[in-house]
């Protein structure tokens, strides 16, 4: 957690947790496995990343202004493939007013349960994404 210009901010990967055989088979074809510079071919490492992320999140206070994660904390409404757990990591409550995430490359901006969710995808160099500037005020 850090404070910047009066904003309390936290960030993590919030890594997902493949659980079923279908999830693991789907995961094996994902770009995360092929392009992110981590050894994610080992199931134990993937599960540990998820456990570490959940422990981090559970230890956060409930009054953050901004959380930034790679993986979204809920299913992205714009992602038709989003039912697979490789696209989100469920959390029980949202501990910030604003949550910015990426991972699934589907841009959106909506509010749910008092938290504004913003997907600001950048993507791989094979796609022409534009950088979106966002101004957040208290």
Positions of PLM-derived features:
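Context-gated lysine
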Residues: 8, 33, 45-48, 75, ...
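Metallo-beta-lactamase
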Residues: 1-5, 63-65
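Short, surface-exposed loop/helix-turn segments at secondary-structure junctions
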Residues: 80-88
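Active-site metal-binding loops of divalent metal-dependent hydrolases
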Residues: 13-15, 70-71, 102-105, 121-124
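Binuclear metal-dependent phosphoesterase catalytic core
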Residues: 3, 88, 92-96, 104-138
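Hydrophobic/aromatic beta-strand patches that form the interior of the parallel beta-sheet core
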Residues: 10, 66, 98-100, 118
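Active-site-proximal loop/helix segment associated with metal-binding centers of metalloenzymes
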Residues: 10-76, 80-81
